A protein has these predicted regions:
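Helix-loop-helix connectors at the membrane interface of multi-pass transporters/channels
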Residues: 71-77, 101-121, 208-228, 280-304
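Transmembrane-helix boundary/entry motifs in multi-pass membrane transporters
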Residues: 2-5, 35-39, 65-93, 111-117, ...
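Membrane-interface interhelical connector segments
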Residues: 177, 238-260
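Membrane-interface loop-to-helix entry segments
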Residues: 104-109, 116-123, 131-162, 322-340
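Extracellular loop-to-transmembrane helix junctions
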Residues: 3-8, 32-59, 217-219, 224-229, ...
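Juxtamembrane transmembrane-helix boundary signature
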Residues: 46-71, 233-237, 241
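Hydrophobic alpha-helical segments and their helix-loop junctions in multi-pass secondary transporters
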Residues: 21, 95, 128, 149-176, ...
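Hydrophobic, membrane-embedded alpha-helices of multi-pass small-molecule transporters
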Residues: 5-24, 43, 91-94, 98, ...
Length: 359
């Protein structure tokens, strides 16, 4: 990456870390925010502010220390076992994403084709494993094109729905919420924390490529505005269609109610989920190979075991997995956020001390 990153590019990259298939499917946004009614909108604002603040903090910490690896940014002290634990937890989160995306494809096949969910998930796992086995991780860049297309499609569908259906205050009544998320406030913090934990390794290496120091703040703020705009559009549209919120893929259900838009959205969702799952599985395989020579030499066996485990995990269902895996990592992510904040304070004090002594 030789080209310097400006404000707009950083904003798109920052937002792209969160605007995945789970986000624009509507399931994730509804569980974390929509289910809490009007207060959920306050939670959304809080989550975006936290993501923006921690994003800037992370970029500045990386710039100040020169550290780009996730484990060293989170764990300041050189404690090998603790840094390894962070790496293992990250790999486990990526594996959880594979399970969630496989379940999502299974739900998609059920909604669009009437296939049993388990069969759709099984087919998805076979395709994901094949892509990983034949070294097609690089082709994931092709599938990532589906993400911005999904964002545009989601906003268009939301706009059409809102144009046809009047949005009233009653539409934002609170519904059934996930007990693991507690109140709207804890749900917001949890959402910000698990997303922060999942993207530390993506954002940190960008620091040395920024055009100027101020780009970190401006780009992150603009990215937050984009996140907020998409989320508000999705939540407002779903608020007018309570029946869609009960579907595994709420925005797909809403799109199908608008006619042919459902087919287009289904294809985009499939590409987005498939790309996310392949890249996540390849990352897990790569990490395992780096940590163990035996696993590196038995990559195929490891791939088969992970695929079987991912299929088993997918049977818990797309909505239930999002409502369980993400909250668990959200609480772990809270610890990661605090550790990064502590690291940032320590680095700033160390810099001030060096400046005072003239070193």
């Amino acid at each position: 990456m030789q080209q310097k990153i400006g404000t707009l590019r950083l904003a798109l990259t920052f937002a792209g870390c969160f605007l995945g298939a789970g986000y624009v499917s509507g399931q994730e946004l509804w569980q974390y925010f929509g289910a809490f009614g009007a207060r959920g909108l306050l939670g959304l604002a809080l989550a975006v502010v936290l993501l923006g603040g921690t994003g800037v903090l992370l970029l500045r910490l990386s710039a100040r220390t020169g550290i780009e690896t996730m484990d060293a940014l989170i764990v300041r002290a050189d404690i090998p076992w603790l840094r390894t634990a962070v790496g293992v937890l990250t790999a486990a989160l990526l594996f959880g994403v594979v399970c969630i995306m496989a379940a999502g494809i299974g739900a998609l096949g059920n909604q669009m084709l009437g296939l049993p969910v388990w069969l759709g998930a099984a087919i998805a796992c076979v395709l994901i494993a094949a892509a990983a086995y034949f070294g097609l991780g690089g082709m994931v860049s092709v599938f990532t094109v589906a993400v911005p297309c999904m964002i545009v499609a989601a906003l268009v569908i939301a706009g059409i729905r809102l144009h046809r259906t009047e949005l009233t205050a009653a539409a934002f009544a609170a519904g059934d919420t996930n007990p693991m998320l507690g109140s709207w406030a804890t749900s917001a913090v949890n959402y910000a924390a698990y997303n922060f934990f999942a993207t530390v390794g993506i954002l940190a290496p960008l620091t040395r490529h920024l055009k100027k120091p101020g780009t970190a703040v401006c780009g992150t703020v603009l990215g937050c505005v984009l996140l907020l705009a998409v989320a508000l559009g999705v939540l407002a549209a779903l608020a007018t269609s309570p029946e869609s919120t009960r579907a595994p893929l709420p925005m797909l259900d809403l799109a199908c109610r608008l006619g042919a838009a459902g087919v287009v959205y289904a294809v985009l969702l499939f590409l987005g989920m498939f790309g996310t799952s392949v890249s996540s599985l390849v990352a897990v395989l790569t990490y395992a190979g780096q940590k163990s020579a035996w696993l590196a030499g038995h990559r195929t066996v490891l791939l088969l075991v992970l695929t079987a485990a991912a299929f088993a995990g997918s049977l818990f269902g797309f909505g239930d997995l999002i409502g369980t895996v993400y909250p668990v990592y959200g609480y772990l992510g809270m610890a990661a956020m605090l550790l990064v904040a502590e690291h940032a304070v320590h680095a700033r004090r160390a810099g001030n001390n060096r400046a005072a002594t003239g070193d």
